[in-house]
């Protein structure tokens, strides 16, 4: 892990609120369209270590076989560039009388560094993506790291006041997260973790990512009922489940083969590939 951290340097990171439109409307309406542009350039500052991708003393090990594709994907040629990523986050909100409205947001990205890989063509015995040649990325890696986009939030909401109580309802793709956890694993594997899958790919490899980009919205119906000043009832029903997102197999920040659904083979002791 120490060598992995030392092997990466942030050369430049730029984030700017490129456009923030507040539309002129009547007092009852609020319409906003915000766009954030973020650019990152990263480079590895150390060359590939043989003991990392071949195991100790030059002997092949399971750990090396499962993790070699990541470090071999970027060498020190071309300044050892790991990423030249451009991100755009667009958010559109329409609110009427602060009580009703909708929100839709989406993100898009382009990273020329993931157009191809530096993985050598002579290491087929531990290559985890045989559907493409070493030196290329699979379809899943290209979609997630090279060029792509996705819808994030897409929901409607309403708030009602009933006497001294209030009821809030949201329907559609949105994020909720209840409470805190004393242990780190509780935030991931507990009730809160089940509500909002995390985009660990962005957390690990895209500096400057905000929480609203890391917690992935899912389709659900949620309510908040304020009974008294000291009592609030919350409920939700989820219509879909999303997996936690990890860096794809063969990319620089991938921790190991076999952790994503798009891994085709995992290499175990003796360098023998195993179909997953």
Segments from the language model and where they lie:
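Gram-negative bacterial Sec-dependent N-terminal signal peptides
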Residues: 1-20
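Outer membrane beta-barrel
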Residues: 98-255
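One-face residue pattern on beta-strands with alternating periodicity enriched for small/polar residues
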Residues: 32-40, 85-93, 153-155, 218-220
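Flexible glycine-rich, low-complexity coil/linker segments exposed to the extracellular/periplasmic environment
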Residues: 51-71, 260-276
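Glycine- and aromatic-enriched membrane insertion/assembly motifs of diderm outer-membrane
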Residues: 70-110
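Transmembrane beta-strand segments of Gram-negative outer membrane beta-barrel proteins
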Residues: 23-68, 102-106
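Outer-membrane beta-barrel proteins
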Residues: 14-31, 74-80, 88-100, 140-144, 156-162, 167, ...
